[in-house]
Swiss-Prot record:
Gene Ontology CC: cytoplasm
Subunit record text: DNA polymerase III contains a core (composed of alpha, epsilon and theta chains) that associates with a tau subunit. This core dimerizes to form the PolIII' complex. PolIII' associates with the gamma complex (composed of gamma, delta, delta', psi and chi chains) and with the beta chain to form the complete DNA polymerase III complex.
Intracellular or extracellular location(s): Cytoplasm
GO-annotated molecular function: 3'-5' exonuclease activity; DNA-directed DNA polymerase activity
Pfam families according to UniProt: DNA_pol3_alpha, DNA_pol3_finger, HHH_6, PHP
Signal peptide: none
EC number: 2.7.7.7
Enzyme category, top tier: transferase
CDD domains: DnaE_OBF, PHP_PolIIIA_DnaE3
Keywords on record: Cytoplasm, DNA replication, DNA-directed DNA polymerase, Nucleotidyltransferase, Transferase
UniProt function note: DNA polymerase III is a complex, multichain enzyme responsible for most of the replicative synthesis in bacteria. This DNA polymerase also exhibits 3' to 5' exonuclease activity. The alpha chain is the DNA polymerase.
Biological process according to GO: DNA replication
Listed name of the protein: DNA polymerase III subunit alpha
Organism: Helicobacter pylori (strain J99 / ATCC 700824)
Amino acid sequence: MKENKAFTHLHLHTEYSLLDGANKIKILAKRIKELGMKSVSVTDHGNMFGAIDFYTSMKKEGIKPIIGMEAYIHNDDNLSSKETKQRFHLCLFAKNQEGYENLMFLSSMAYLEGFYYFPRINKKLLREHSKGIIASSACLQGEVNYHLNTNNERNRKYGAKGYDEAKRIACEYQEIFEDDFYLEIMRHGILDQRFIDEQVIKMSLETGLKIIATNDTHYTMPNDAKAQEVAMCVAMGKTLNDKGRLKHSVHEFYIKSPEEMAKLFADIPEALENTQEIADKCVLEIDLKDDKKNPPTPPSFKFTKAYAQNEGLSFEDDASYFAHKAREGLRERLILVPEEKHEQYKERLEKEIEVITNMKFPGYMLIVWDFIRYAKEMGIPVGPGRGSAAGSLVAFALKITDIDPLKYDLLFERFLNPERVSMPDIDTDFCQRRRKEIIEYMIEKYGKYNVAQVITFNKMLAKGVIRDVARVLDMPYKEADDFAKLIPNRLGITLKGYEKNGEFIEGAWELEPKIKELVESNEVAKQVWEYSLNLENLNRNAGVHAAALVVDSQKELWHKTPLFASEKTGGIVTQYSMKYLEPVDLIKFDFLGLKTLTVIDDALKIIKTQHNIDVDFLSLDMDDPKVYKTIQSGDTVGIFQIESGMFQGLNKRLRPSSFEDIIAIIALGRPGPMESGMVDDFVNRKHGVEPIAYAFKELEPILKPTYGTIVYQEQVMQIVQTIGGFSLGEADLIRRAMGKKDAQIMADNKAKFVEGAKNLGHDGQKAANLWDLIVKFAGYGFNKSHSAAYAMITFQTAYLKTYYKHEFMAAMLTSESNKIESVARYIDEVRALEIEVMPPHINSSMQDFSVAEFKNQKGELEKKIVFGLGAVKGVGGEPIKNIIEERAKGDYKSLEDFISRVDFSKLTKKSLEPLVKSGSLDNLGYTRKTMLANLDLICDAGRAKDKANEMMQGGNSLFGAMEGGIKEQVVLDMVDLGEHDAKTLLECEYETLGIHVSGNPLDEFKEEIKGFKNLVKSIDIEELEIGSQAYLLGKIMEVKKKIGKRSGKPYGTADILDRYGKFELMLFEKQLNALEELDINKPLVFKCKIEEQEEVARLRLFEILDLESAREVKIPKARYKDPEKQKEDVREIPPMEMLASSSCSLAIVLENDVKKEFLRQIKESALKHQGKRPLYLIIKDKDKQFKIQSDLMVNEKIKDDFKGLEWRDLA
């Protein structure tokens, strides 16, 4: 390592100058050290995103970090002014803590108040917050240099005024910063820089301002230049071949050595020395927190005194008020606890209060208590708990959680360990729809700048960087896609392997030999690979963390973190990412939006409307056999956490019969336990196939709920405590070490465990064997507290599906109404439950899916789900609200009645058209075709009616005021055009609903598609194993063709419909050519392979077959994740009209010589399979057929008893 005392880089862009700077901080730190430099600055564009990452990385390498930013500044006194787009660059550096806080404030205001294309500050703000800050005139875009550079035509055009103006501005900055303003010169070989060089030196002599020499550094090594260009192209959506793209004219923007800089500035060595002067002035030391030596400051509730006074109490501090609320809450909870156990609860509570108080976390607990209290008061659904907090009795007493930790043997030490100082971490689930209200409450309570969400940085990871770079290099789409798919689907995969803790972790290069073959045989692929290696893991863009929120009740957040404004949400976000918030003394709270809570809330509201019942989940019978029967059947679509194919199979195998079993299912249903044999042990022991044995009798109470199998982390802790004599705090530390596979700690503690066991009178060898067993399963162990809390939601949803299936499934459909494929899937599930879904209609539909009673063929009332108007694409909330409000006065009797009553200032042509196309205005006197042809006439009539109403009610018309508006109905002059053909109707329905109502495009091909076995449904694609072969039958609805920019070859996508929904396939030239030989107006069979792309199952097309060719192929069974589903023999595609299907009649076709005995068998079967479909007999006699209606109502399962016969659906 060389040593340098004369130069510090003061103009440097890291990876946090998103896709402009390409200096990866960890690599940068090593390079600075290698070049012998003792200090370095960061000046990212307009932000401080990377300040703490930079600070800690440089400190680790023994380099002095200088925190700065290259600010954007404009000259309007109104910071938020949009009058001018002109902005200049100015480099700012924090000298000390005051300067650092001022810098954070300036950066925050640039985003929150000054943002206009870029985050901007102005000189007024700069004057007010300049203390502790050093500034320099920046690059050619700096204001001083801009006016000096009259050689540049663009500068002259936009107002560059020359030397005198530049000097005036320099003196203005000198007046603001005094001796801490420096003139900056750069020498990259750019003509404009040479033009201003002498003028800057002249200005320095005339003003006494010192000069610093800088290099506008955007990447680390000289050979990184091209990769940085590629990154810029990714940011702008350009390719390297695009003309006029933004690019550097020279390749000099790398980390130059002190020697290189000395050579460049040999004529002005003081410019180098002055960089060191700035470095010496900067003495900032950031007080970073860590759990061990310098723990973060626990947050204060701040409102304790006011809250206590409201309750007529007197508490001055958080601790005493917290203890009071916890004890008060426990008294309420103990009402449902047997009296003989009260003392146990009180002792546990006091122990927890003591630990929380000693660790100084009462304020934290009160903050959480308060926002959950508010949510519940406002009727915002809150989850029963999440994570390790469910193990705390205090949390249960404060109603932060709703799971009794003593009842389910949950451990407080899993939440807070008194032997290891770490911040509590309570994650809270809220109704997804209303989560925003809780954030708004926090902002209102603590202050606009005291609450913020947390920034995230999306990185260019292995697959993504290949795709990005391939696009920039104009690689044909299919080649790029194939290249990216070579990257193995493995969590945390990197392009090349690396060493970690002495272990070599293989990357894609080592795992997939085809990558090497491709890179060595294809020049473009080689370039893609090389640039991708350079850019991998670079920050791509900024986002917002899905859950995290930080709160400081004492002062504005910019004292600890600069702030950022999210373009997506408009909300305030920290500039520091999650990893760096605790070090700067900020504690995060997680507010998660859980869709299931919204579904439950909607279901409860429908139940209240339908039955006037308030379901109380806290008083449910947790041993209800009907609920467990639902779960055991595998009928778990819509049931929280256990609805996937894998869980359905697990439910059938395990057959849960207690709440403890549900807790275990959630813990077991993960790849680790499934692959380790834990699940087999659990199932076999539960059902008596294997004996339950305990190595020590003391283990029975710990392992009995899981049939002798170690399933939970808490069990590991209890075993270590009970057999080895450890405290639960020590046991928690061992659990953590096992999770991290820390070999040394585990080896040390094994000896301690065995010795402890011996001291307690246990056999040492048996203890050693037990330790090895613990180590084996600890890696798969799950947090029981989390599992128990989520099992509560599982039970609640299973209860609703068992007892209120119509209401529950209506709520499920509402939750998915913006996802076509999901609606199709759930409607399929509704059909399986023999629930009829009525199409949307203005006289029966609400905003959301709802439940209503209709008379059936026998005149009996029957519950059905009604399609929600909100699920009709393109209508909008306001028109629907108006339609429903007006309908409360009575159903719409005709189209004229509808027009005369609805407000057409809200119902526009754009909203009316999807209502007509979806069938929502059927039975109002006109066909859809007629209404669609007369949309303008209908809207004109509606607006004319609105205008007339306005005049009549105005009080100043010729007729005076008419109460109630126009009483006469609108008269329409529309010619009946008949109805569209079936194909057009179906297309309109699919366009507006995402599904077909009046039939299915495959209906006309029913006979042709009979008899195929083992076809995969589109809704089951996610249930298939990756790598499995799948055959799907469907009809192509649309083909979108494109031409590859570079290859010039055609490619495209096809939207394909089967009886269950839609799926998409990528088509390349070969497949597009194949389609030209096929009749795409008929169903086709698609041979595909299941691949994983970005953790989602995708179909890769191999072959397209017409039906005739497909019949000659022996279609193999697809491989499902659920072994039970694998056993199914998928035969004919069942008839499926997605809506109102159960009202269709079912007919069995018989020959005219049918025997009476056979008819008796049919009747017995019909009585066994009673349902809602009228049963007909079709008797064939030569070329004639006779249809006979029976008095029997059946379901689909009757077909299974007579598989050899023909069945038909009758409208």
